[in-house]
UniProtKB/Swiss-Prot annotation:
Belongs to the IMPDH/GMPR family. GuaC type 1 subfamily. Keywords: Metal-binding, NADP, Oxidoreductase, Potassium. One of its GO terms (cellular component) is GMP reductase complex. Pfam families: IMPDH. It comes from Yersinia pestis. K(+) binds at G181, G183. Homotetramer. This is GMP reductase. Catalyzes the irreversible NADPH-dependent deamination of GMP to IMP. It functions in the conversion of nucleobase, nucleoside and nucleotide derivatives of G to A nucleotides, and in maintaining the intracellular balance of A and G nucleotides. NADP(+) binds at residues 108-131, 216-239. The keyword NADP applies. Disulfide bonds: none annotated.
Length: 347
């Protein structure tokens, strides 16, 4: 046993210090990024935000809408091959290039992933997703996927420390997914005592990834647009959002009614709700590590996406970054004891 003494920070612990700027308007800020990925060699450009691969958020409808904003969607792994075939058949290349094919790490998952990717050459992204990216089995699956799909962009995770980011990149990942426990419906930290404050994880993992020519995606912990800006400011190349995109028309959560008002259920993918839906219940040897919440219906995701992108542009304007890529170079974090004036509640 040992204790690391250094303080680790989450998004709520900091604000971004404003700096002099030559920008006259938020409209001058470009949010698009361009990447050439380490292993696949593929060039991609777009807004580096990803809808999370949760079965209520990472849906085909979400992918169709977010593609119009040049935003990615990690489509969840529970769609059947037939549903994928129907989606690919009706979708133009402009949508498919913004889709990530999510997979677990079983042999059946591998075979299904290969069948889905074979539906269209426009499907370029793979998202290998497990709760604990520190297992040897996970690394072996990643290596197998890289060998089988040399021209695909592979995003793999989740991890929170630099040495594991390096191992995943050296094993074939183009992008490493960073985050254990920060999600809005994740209870891993309270069930297991395991985790890492998200901002510090992003800063440390970005440093490790960029040294090897890889990228990271900050997954979890964002509850407002300012958190997204902090993630990019901390060095994240992509930011994955679940709760901020939940409860919209494009989601597939079950709708319930209480006292005449409708709500959509949103739950973590290790929650009892998710395991009952997909594997028949919680296995006797494990505990659920997610919760279920009821969200008021929020309409189309369009307005939420515009709000997030507007917040990002404004953050860039405050620090003089004309391109999103410059935000991390222009960011100085200050530690704070409060984030906002709550005399009239929170927005």
């Amino acid at each position: 046993m040992r204790i690391e003494e250094g303080l680790k920070l989450g998004f709520k612990d900091v604000l971004i210090r404003p700096k002099r700027s030559t920008l006259k308007s938020r409209s001058e800020v470009a949010l698009e990024r361009q990447f050439t990925f380490k292993h696949s060699g593929w060039n991609w450009s777009g807004v580096p935000i990803i809808a999370a691969n949760m079965d209520t958020v990472g849906t085909f409808r979400m992918a169709e809408v977010l593609a119009s904003f040049d935003i990615l969607t990690a489509v969840h792994k529970h769609y059947t091959l037939e549903q994928w075939a129907e989606f690919v058949k009706r979708s133009p290349e402009s949508v498919l290039r913004h889709v990530m094919v999510s997979t677990g790490t079983s042999s059946a998952d591998f075979d299904k992933m290969k069948q889905i990717l074979a539906l269209s050459p426009s499907l370029k992204f793979i998202c290998i997703d497990v709760a604990n990216g520190y297992s040897e089995h996970f690394v072996s699956f990643l290596q197998r996927a890289r060998e089988a799909c040399p021209d695909k962009v592979i995003c793999a995770g989740n991890v929170v420390t630099g040495e594991m980011v390096e191992e995943l990149i050296l094993s074939g990942a183009d992008i490493v997914k960073v985050g254990i426990g920060p999600g809005s419906v994740c209870t891993t930290r309270v069930k297991t005592g395991v985790g890492y404050p998200q901002l510090s994880a992003v800063i440390e993992c970005a440093d490790a990834a960029h040294g090897l020519g890889g990228q990271i995606v900050s997954d979890g912990g964002c509850s407002v647009p300012g958190d997204v800006a902090k993630a990019f400011g901390g060095g994240a190349d992509f930011v994955m959002l679940g709760g901020m995109l939940a409860g919209h028309d494009e989601c597939e959560g079950r709708v319930v009614e209480e006292n005449g008002e409708k709500f959509m259920l949103f739950y973590g993918m290790s929650s009892e709700s998710a395991m009952k839906r997909h594997v028949g219940g919680v296995a006797q040897y494990r505990a659920a590590e997610g919760k279920t919440v009821k969200l008021p219906l929020r309409g189309s995701v369009d307005n939420t996406v515009r709000d997030i992108m507007g917040g990002l542009r404004s953050a860039c304007t405050y620090v003089g970054a004309s391109h999103l890529k410059e935000l991390t170079k222009r960011t100085t974090f200050i530690r704070v004891a409060e984030q906002e004036n709550r005399v009239f509640g929170t927005d």
